[in-house]
Structures are given as structure tokens and as C-alpha cells.
Amino acid sequence: MQAFTQHEGLVALLDRENVDTDLIIPKQFLKSIKRAGFGPNLFDELRYLDHGEPGMDNSKRPLNSDFVLNQPRYQGASVLLARKNFGCGSSREHAPWALTQYGFRAIIAPSYADIFFNNSFKNGLLPIVLGELEVARLFDEVKAFPGFKLNIDLERQVVIAPDGRELGFDIEPFRKYCLLNGLDDIGLTLRQADKIRAFEAERLARHPWLESRPVA
């Protein structure tokens, strides 16, 4: 998992509440459990004018020019500004997969659905909670100033606006540690590899029959 320490990125906005996981990545794209290939279908029903299905050549599909991610000013955005209850609906880890594979490193919103919030941390996506008034001001600024960027300093737990103001945010220490060090669940487990091997060797010495093999 890619570590997250500090990130400055162009901000794209999604000005709607209760964005559910089916809107983030529609159900027909959940047939694969590989963590690859979901970025082109992020917000599929909003980005394209036709109905998307797995295997379609997205480069030939008609784009919805009104959708923010299709507008030139938001190309290359890596910070998503959203409204409250982002990521609600069914549990699907494909949602943060699609967001990160598109290129987003962080989301800023007043609130999130719990499961999406937890899944985001496990996949290197930083979900930042700011107050509704702060988020509303950021929305106004993004709309008013093309090329609007934010600097996110995870170590200091602040979002820094272009005018220099700092917006603090909370994060659980363990989640912060994992993001700073690029550790997902597998990475955390591998840090204990020596202890795991020592335990397996001791168990085998005490209970050798547990590793017995059937006679051919």
C-alpha cells in the first residue's frame, strides 16, 4: 500500500449528498476481486451517457460533458470534495479501489458511511472529516478558482488552503500510523513474520503429528 505523508492535489467536487457505493462503482463491475481495472468505471453512471458493462471499451463510450470528472479544469484531480454521508449503501471494497485507481488520494466530506470509512483506510485512501461550514466554503472556493489545490499534511493533521489557512482534522492514531507507513492488513502481518515462523517451529516441535502427511 502506498504511504501517505503529505499530498498536494487538485480538488474536484461532487456536489450531492448521500453518494452511495453503487454510484461510486456500479454492481455490474463487482465480478472481479482483483484490485485492478476499476478506475475507468468510477462513477460510471455519471461519467458516461450509456449503460456500462464489464469488458466495454470505455474510450469509445459517449461522455457526459456535464459531469465534473469529464471537465478539463478537473483533469488530474487527486482530492475529492464531497457532501455528507459519502459512501453509504452496500459494503463493497471495490469503492475505495475505484477511487484510488482513478487517482484520488483523499476525500474531504462532513461525514461518511462507517463501512466505506473503514475500507478507505485499509486501501490507502484518506477520508477527512471537516465541518459542514468548512466544506461549504471549500466548495465555493473550488467553483470560483479553477486549478484550486489543497495541501494535506497527515503528520500534522491539517488541510492547508491556498490562502494559508489550516483546517485541522482528527484521525485515530493506529490508522494514522498505518497510512504514514503504507501498511495494510497484510503489511502489518508481515511485520510479525519472524514471530509467526518462531511460533510455527515451536508448535511443530511440541505437536509434530499436526503436520503429519498421509501415507501414499
Curated annotation (Swiss-Prot):
Which is one Pfam family of this protein?
A: Aconitase_C
The UniProt entry's GO CC annotations, sorted and at most eight, read: 3-isopropylmalate dehydratase complex
Q: What is its EC number?
A: 4.2.1.33
- Role description: Catalyzes the isomerization between 2-isopropylmalate and 3-isopropylmalate, via the formation of 2-isopropylmaleate.
Self-association or partners: how does it assemble? Heterodimer of LeuC and LeuD.
What NCBIfam families does the entry give? leuD, PRK01641.1
HAMAP family given in the database record: LeuD_type1
Q: What family name appears in the similarity comment?
A: Belongs to the LeuD family. LeuD type 1 subfamily.
What protein does this entry describe? Answer: 3-isopropylmalate dehydratase small subunit 2
